[in-house]
Swiss-Prot record:
GO molecular function annotations of the record: 4-(cytidine 5'-diphospho)-2-C-methyl-D-erythritol kinase activity; ATP binding
Reactions this protein catalyses: 4-CDP-2-C-methyl-D-erythritol + ATP = 4-CDP-2-C-methyl-D-erythritol 2-phosphate + ADP + H(+)
Descriptive protein name: 4-diphosphocytidyl-2-C-methyl-D-erythritol kinase
Top enzyme category: transferase
Active site: K29, D155
Pfam families xref list: GHMP_kinases_C, GHMP_kinases_N
Species the sequence originates in: Haemophilus influenzae (strain ATCC 51907 / DSM 11121 / KW20 / Rd)
Domain of life, source organism: Bacteria
Binding-site residues, ATP: P113, M114, G115, G116, G117, V118, G119, G120, G121, S122, S123
Gene name in the database record: ispE
PANTHER family: 4-DIPHOSPHOCYTIDYL-2-C-METHYL-D-ERYTHRITOL KINASE, CHLOROPLASTIC
Keyword Transferase assigned: yes
Functional description taken from the UniProt entry: Catalyzes the phosphorylation of the position 2 hydroxy group of 4-diphosphocytidyl-2C-methyl-D-erythritol.
């Protein structure tokens, strides 16, 4: 499969041109571990999970519309009204919050699988918020953007913050951390997972003891949803069993994606070349700093450098 790793592409993508769209990365994520500690009276589950970004994902091509305040989003997604799209909703939220009179043209280059548990929709929403905050010069803080993002989805603030994080509660308590940046083979089985079905299953563990982050990082990582998911979805079980032949492997989130971890890229690529054709998949490196935030840091640095150049007389 064609590589869409951000690290090589970003080097050529940090020059701003008037009227021309900029390409902003919208990275995937993995839940390196996921434990369910209990259930709140409101029905939400209490979790402990570790998020890490991947050097792989979608792209959003964004340009400012100065002639009006319209949000023009392409392409259309079948069976999804534009006003219900998370990208569109994120842009409108930011417009209203910061009283922005400008608009935007946004094109989604969709690469990540739908319903894979790698955060595609949440990442798209966060990239829209963070990128438009920069382009429109809305000047909202990361915390303000994260609060907006939380109204769109529980995982959106993680992508807005842009750093690998340990999340607790229902995901609202976030602690930045630095897990090892390993290489991963990620497979997407041909199953569409119902998160509601998984969390309503009576066999789902709901009493895993809470532990400190230090203790969790020192132990083998697990996902409490994994056994229930493979009991419901045979293709997930097949993909997981295939990966387990080569390396430690597990489910991310509630799936359907599964992943195996490797210390070196060559090992991951060698396994990926043997992948059964039935599975969509890719190889990516784990990143503790989001490629989106790395790009914005480069853009800000370039802009500051240009402003500080002496005039030539």
């Amino acid at each position: 499969m064609k590589s869409h790793q951000f690290s090589t592409a970003l080097c050529q993508n940090t020059t701003e041109s008037n009227g021309q769209p900029l390409r902003f990365p919208s990275p995937a994520k993995l839940n390196l571990f996921l434990y369910i500690n209990g259930k709140f009276p409101n029905g939400y589950h209490e979790l402990q999970t570790l998020f890490q970004f991947l050097d792989f994902g979608d792209w959003l091509d964004i340009s400012i519309r100065e002639q009006d305040n319209q949000i023009v989003l392409t392409p259309e997604i079948p069976n999804l009204k534009t006003e219900n799209n998370l990208i569109y909703r994120a842009a409108k939220l930011l417009q209203e919050k910061a009283n922005i009179q400008l608009g935007a043209n946004i094109h989604l280059d969709k690469i990540l699988p739908m319903g894979g548990g790698v955060g595609g929709g949440s990442s798209n929403a966060a990239t829209a918020l963070v990128s438009l905050n920069y382009l429109w010069q809305a000047n909202l803080s990361i915390d303000e953007l994260a609060k907006l993002g939380l109204t769109l989805g529980a995982d959106v603030p993680i992508f807005v913050h842009g750093h690998a994080a340990f999340a607790e509660g229902v995901g609202e308590k976030i602690t930045y951390c630095e897990p090892a940046e390993k290489w991963f083979v990620i497979l997407k089985p041909d199953d569409s997972i119902s998160t509601a079905v998984i969390f309503q299953d009576p066999n789902l563990p709901r009493n895993t003891p809470k532990k400190s982050l230090a203790q969790l990082l020192s132990e083998p990582y697990k996902n409490d949803c994994e056994k229930v998911v493979i009991n419901h979805y045979s293709n997930v079980e097949k993909a997981l069993n295939w990966l387990l032949q080569y390396a430690p492997a597990r489910l991310t989130g509630t799936g359907a994606c599964v992943f195996a971890e490797f210390d070196h890229e060559a090992e991951a690529q060698a396994v990926f070349r043997q992948k059964p054709e039935a599975f969509f998949g890719f190889v990516a490196k784990g990143l503790n700093v989001s490629p989106l935030h790395a790009m914005l840091k480069q853009l800000s640095s370039t802009h500051t450098h240009r402003q500080s150049k002496p005039e030539v007389l």
